[in-house]
Amino acid sequence: CCVNCGQGNELDGLDERAKLSGASKLYIEDIVDDFCDNYIMPCVQAGAVYEHKYLLGTSMARPAIAKKLVEIARKENAVAICHGATGKGNDQIRFELGIKALAPDIKIIAPWRMTDVWTMQSRDDELAFCQAHGINLPFDASHSYSRDRNLWHISHEGLELEDPSNEPNYDDLLVMSTTPEKAPDKAEYVTMTFEKGVPKSINGEEMKVSDIIRKLNELGGKHGIGIIDIVENRVVGMKSRGVYETPGGTILY
C-alpha cells in the first residue's frame, strides 16, 4: 500500500516496481486533501515547529499514512502491517504508535530491525536488489539521497550530508526550490485571506487548502524561500543532519 500525500511524479511506475518486487496487489490511496485539512492545518494553527526551524513535514504525514494502512489492512483482513522504516529513525515510532493506537491487534513487521532474516542492510543493498531483479529506478547510487516528499515539503539525508563539514550540493539536491542566490532579484507580492488560521484565498482567488499550498510552493520555491540545513535530535537519541525544502509552508508560517 502506498499513500499519496502529494509526492507528485514519485508515484510513477509503482505498479510495475511492486509486481517485480513480488506484490500481488497494490493500493495507491490519495489522501492529499485529508492530509492538508486535518493534519497540516491544525499544526499551522498551533504554530508547531520542531527545534526552531523544522515545520514537521514528515511528522505530520505519518499518522495520516498509518490511518490509511489500517483501513486497507481491515479491508484485506490482514493480520500484519509491514513498513520500511529503519531501526535508527523516528518513522518506525510514528508508524507503529499510529497503527497500534488504531488497531492494537495487528502485528507489525519491521524488516530493517530483523537483521537475522533480512539481508538488505543499506541503500546500496537495495539498489543492488533492484538491479538484479530488473526494477528500474529514477536515480542511481550517486543521487540516492534518502528523501521524503509530500505536498508540504521534501527532506534530504545521506550522501555528502552525512559529514557535517560538507556543504550541501544544492545543484543536485534541491527539487522544489532554487537557492536565494539564483532567485529573481525582483520581489513578488502575495495577498492572502485567512479564517480561524486557515488560508482561504490568494490574491482574491478562493482555493481549497491543497491548491493554496501548491501555489505557495511554486511562488516560494522560485524565490528560494524555506530551505533549511539542520542537525536535529531523533527520538532514539541519535542526531541526524537534513536539508528541508518547505517553500509554501514557510510563507504560511
Annotated model-derived regions:
Residues 1-253:
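Nucleotide-activated chemistry modules centered on ATP-dependent adenylation/adenylyltransferase
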